[in-house]
Amino acid sequence: MKLYNDDCLDVLKTIESESVDLVVTDCPYHICSGCCSNDAVKIGRYTEPGGIFQKRKDSHGNTYMTDTKHVSLCGIFNDADPTTYTKQGKLFKFNDIEFSDWLPDIYRVLKSETHCYIMINPRNLKELQQSCEDVGFVFQQLIVWDKGNATPNKYYLNAYELILMLRKGKAMNINNMGTKNILRVPNIIKTKQHPTEKPYELMKILIENSSNEGQIVLDPFMGVGATGVAAKKNGQRVHRHRNR
């Protein structure tokens, strides 16, 4: 197992081309927690309400797009004074990383006839899939992770997340062809060490289906390391990177 405690955008460029057998990762994307959504608009890559970054105006009428470089964020910061909180909320780290910053290198380091799994939410799915296809990936399947629990809100409870399954080169069968595309794995609740931590059992299914013992699994955004634990227990070699 190799663990790189460094900026994945730098480390990826040092990995040899076509040296990785599988990528499984939960990448950063533009979202926050605790945000309002009353005046969201669709401007380019910034899409629906509910925590997604929005086009805003400051107290002088100047329009800007909220992101991690501007601390102003809908529902969290006051427009007149961007340093003042108006309600509780938090901005997830590394939201300034674009898909185009790392996907070309992911495609480059993967061998031909391999799979890539990327966790994503519904609002960012379209952009991620397009970005993946732009660098050469072929869409294989959309997998649903049924978390089995959800946080109450005013709409239907959000009890699932999506996993975009891609391939490089020709299609390759998964090892357990009886696996359904709805994976019912309970989410981590009480023992969670990271806001977006994924269960070991979920990573285990993906790794066992798309790689074999001794092969190299890459996770450029390792979080608490569930991908690495699953790969190591299954006999694969793993490269894990921590985000900047």
Could you tell me what each predicted segment is?
Residues 167-171:
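Short loop segments at secondary-structure junctions
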